[in-house]
Amino acid sequence: MAETYRFPRFSHEENGTVEPLPLKTGPDKKAIPHIRIVKVGDPPKHGVRYLDVLLLGFFETPKQGPLSGSISDLTESTSYSICGSGSLPIGIAKYYGTDQELLKACIDLKITVRRTVRSGEMIVYMVDSIHAPLLPWSSRLRQGMIYNANKVALAPQCLPVDKDIRFRVVFVNGTSLGTITIAKVPKTLADLALPNSISVNLLVTLKAGVSTEQKGILPVLDDDGEKKLNFMVHLGIIRRKVGKIYSVEYCKNKIEKMKLIFSLGLVGGISFHVHATGTLSKTLMSQLAWKKAVCYPLMDLNPHMNLVIWAASVEITSVDAVFQPAIPKEFRYYPNVVAKSIGKIRKI
């Protein structure tokens, strides 16, 4: 059984909440576009800022009308039917304009979509009509982008392969950052296993303003009977000299010295941010690539949960440090479902 340490409430009280997107419709019964910006770190209050942008909207296909062959068919605008919802992450750039200018430029984008497959199902985005506010992102938009389908589409199986598909942007999520760099723990360091070490993981508990059961995300009841969601992230490992005994108090003392501050952002949907304002050991600092601010996008940790809650209100209710023995190197990781005898798979 693992030992835990609960961080004080003030560690996530200030920026541990994300407000919901207002899902309102206009006279045409279409969703009214909206932009939602949150701050992470210490971004400037005015002027130039570093902004990470995620576009949210609907996948649509042209409606099949009657083949009348009249001249009006050439002048009437094509109507579309929704076949799914999803997102398009366009990344970080230095932005000079206003929120409303950015929203207008995003909803004016003409985005065509194609569903394909490599080692897994993918969604290909091709972008046109890039206006001035989006010029800081123009290089990656013009090149086209491809993403794991399960990360950016709520139901990729609903996207037809024999029809034209467009992605209509309705909402824009933005994360205003204090730096142009979003630091993530490299996979090689996150998978690091050292002898005589303790793995420090964080159990993050959330309260979401949306019912998730019908979409396959089962909540957990807390002590008060409230429905909560949770996920885990790996912070790093604590290592002591051979022969030294790890006590719970020793681990807690290490964590308290870090003075961790937690916040929620909108990188890739919902993102969890950790900022160390205290002292870290050299071992832990090296695992965090010598960064004191780290981002954990839920899109990478739990894609399905992210898809379900990315438009809702989300609040951190608690964060616990979980102290567990590091997994020995001898343990084998099997990323594939099909394995023969000891897990070896013959590759073509």
UniProtKB/Swiss-Prot annotation:
Chief location: virion
Pfam families in UniProt: Matrix_Paramyxo_C (PF23765), Matrix_Paramyxo_N (PF00661)
Cysteine-cysteine disulfides: C251-C295
Signal peptide (from-to): none
Entry keyword Disulfide bond: yes
GO molecular function per UniProt: structural constituent of virion
GO terms for cellular component: viral envelope
InterPro entries listed in its UniProt record: Matrix_C (IPR042539), Matrix_N (IPR042540), Matrix_Paramyxo_C (IPR055413), Matrix_Paramyxo_N (IPR000982)
Gene Ontology biological process: virion assembly
Compartments, record wording: Virion
Keywords, comma-separated and alphabetical: Disulfide bond, Viral envelope protein, Viral matrix protein, Virion
Keyword Disulfide bond assigned: yes
Described function: The M protein has a crucial role in virus assembly and interacts with the RNP complex as well as with the viral membrane.
Similarity remark: Belongs to the morbillivirus/respirovirus/rubulavirus M protein family.
Protein's UniProt name: Matrix protein
